[in-house]
Amino acid sequence: MPKVIHLNLRVDPTQYIPQIREVPGYDYIHLVRQPKYMVNLPLLNEKVHYLSEIFSPQEYVEKNKVSLLHAHHAQLGLLLLPFKEETSLPLVTSIRGRDATLANQPVGYLDGMKMLFEQGELFLPVCQYLAHRINLWGCPIDKIRVLYGGVDLNLFPYKGPNLQGSQNIVSIGRLVEKKGHHVLMEAFKKIKSNFPNATLTIIGGGELEGYIKSLATQLNLGTSFRLLSRVPKSQVPELMGQADIFCAPSLTASNGDVEGIPNTIKEAMATGIPVLATNHAGIPEIITNNKDGILVRENDVDHLAQALEFMLLSKHLWEGYAIAARQTVEQNFDQNKQLLLQAKYYDELLGGS
């Protein structure tokens, strides 16, 4: 069985784990930069190694019988270029969002990316939007294959929309600017008087936690608003199941940072929760407006408020959205199908079928 070195930022229970450890027909080494990035002990095993402890890439590759390198961010692809040069192994690089922008990047990042495009064999952006971005930067189109992040459909079974009387709006994501939580809170404030029983729950932690709490006070959202900033990933399906509407108000951050396609959108669609999201980055690749959800302009409080009001008043449409959304996820975002596609890309690169 061919073995792949996967370099990731850290070891934690993200959506990257299946793309590292569950690719059919391929064994793995889970490489992180150094032990301090080993943050989730249950995921620690004998296949977790540290880049800082590899002094001779050639000896390491020969000892471990490695066939392929896979960096799970462009920045990590740059880190693996010297490794690739010494070992002559093919290099695959995933492109996930910020790495296809100049947001908070070091001086010379674009020059580094052009070198990566020249020397790397294969690039796997997580959506067509990012594929287009890196092509504009100079990545040859024949080196690009879109690989969507998949959803474990067993973990997120279809339940259908909640058609009872509750009006719970839920948003899940790190508390960073590009998630657009502040826009959602302002939109929710605009409709609150018309829907006194409606609630808004934001689930996630991050650098803007203090700002989000302050904004909730400023908007006088009171008990209609909850921020759950310390939630284990294992509890997310249960909390998502309490939603009547899932909202992903993503936007382009002031520093240029963008999304790919938020995994939480895929998870909500899989379970049959009506989804309201912005026309941002790769999101239109999973949601067709008025078919399997609703799309609004990004960073537009009034448009989002109108859409929230429409959704809350249109429960008769929810089941249609939910059924279409589940079909979309099953067809294009099933984790098992995407892992098979990843294996196919590896096979092609290594000269297989």
Residue ranges and their predicted role:
Residues T14-P18, Q167, S171-S193, E207-K213, ...:
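A conserved mid-protein helix/loop that constitutes part of the nucleotide-sugar donor-binding site
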Residues A71-L76, I95:
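Short His-centered aromatic/hydrophobic patch
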Residues N104-V107, N135, I141, V151-S166:
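Acidic anion/phosphate-binding donor-loop and adjacent secondary structure
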Residues Y129, G150:
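Carbohydrate-associated surface elements
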Residues K213-S234:
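Nucleotide-activated donor-binding/catalytic signature segment of Leloir-type glycosyltransferases, i.e.
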Residues G241-G256, I273:
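Acidic donor-binding loop of glycosyltransferase active sites
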Residues I265, A270, P274-A277, I287:
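Short hydrophobic beta-strand element within catalytic cores of glycosyltransferases
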Residues N289-N290, I294-V301, F310-H316:
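Conserved acidic donor-binding segment of nucleotide-sugar-dependent glycosyltransferases
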